[in-house]
Amino acid sequence: SSAASDVYKRQGGYRGLAMNHEGHDMAKWYASNGFVAVVLKYRMPEGVHTIPLSDAEKAMSVIRGNAAKWNLDANKVGVIGSSAGGHLAASLSTLAADANRPDFAILYYPVISFDNMTTHGGSKKNLLGTDIENKELVDRYSLQKQVDDKTPKTLLLLSDDDQTVPPLNSILYYTALNEHHIPASLYMFPSGGHGWGFRYDFTYYQEVKDLIQKWLTYIKITD
């Protein structure tokens, strides 16, 4: 395949990187299925909220700018993110310049909303820093409010018993996508909690892989 899967991973609430089961392990699987997989080691915000998205946009620009050289289809570049990395992937999908938006997104149990009743407190605190009560920024990074007609097709994967990032985050994002007529699918597994990524011991490990493959075929990224 000439498609490029752009893999961003971060868990730990914009505080650290989970580079294995939510980074390199994912990338290896996508690569084994014909994708060029890129794992982005982006900078932590430390309260400077523009830093992660700036790094993500730069990565997209580099990938698309080298598409011909790397034998990639510049119109099949996707983003994958988990937890806080899912928030970054959704930020790229909604807030980035048009040229840097992905063509599809796969979000695992993402942080979406920064509303206090819904959010993951650590992600909000670490991204916004001293601006944590700034309503304009809270609204900006409540990404269900930023979905528009240019937001890419999205697959959401999560567990009903997630006690870290409330499932309502994904539901809000799916609803916003649906309202804008963006093709979207949401799969909520009955168990698994948070942070399972590509762990072999996740009960629905094989089902996740099957769903991803079928969805990528359905949206015509793969044959």
Label each PLM-derived region with a short phrase:
Residues 171-223:
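C-terminal catalytic histidine-bearing segment of alpha/beta-hydrolase fold enzymes
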Residues 11-50, 87, 115, 163, ...:
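Short substrate-entry loop that stabilizes the transition state in hydrolases
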Residues 18-25, 38-74, 199-207:
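Catalytic nucleophile-loop/oxyanion-hole region of alpha/beta-hydrolase
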Residues 131-146, 151-152:
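Active-site nucleophile elbow and catalytic-triad environment of alpha/beta-hydrolase enzymes
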Residues 163-172:
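Conserved alpha/beta-hydrolase "acid-adjacent" motif
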Residues 150, 155-158, 162:
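Short beta-strand/loop motif that positions the catalytic acidic residue
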Residues 58-122, 138:
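Primarily recognizes the serine-hydrolase "nucleophile elbow" in alpha/beta-hydrolase
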Residues 2-8:
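Short, small-residue-biased leader/transition segments that mark boundaries at the very start
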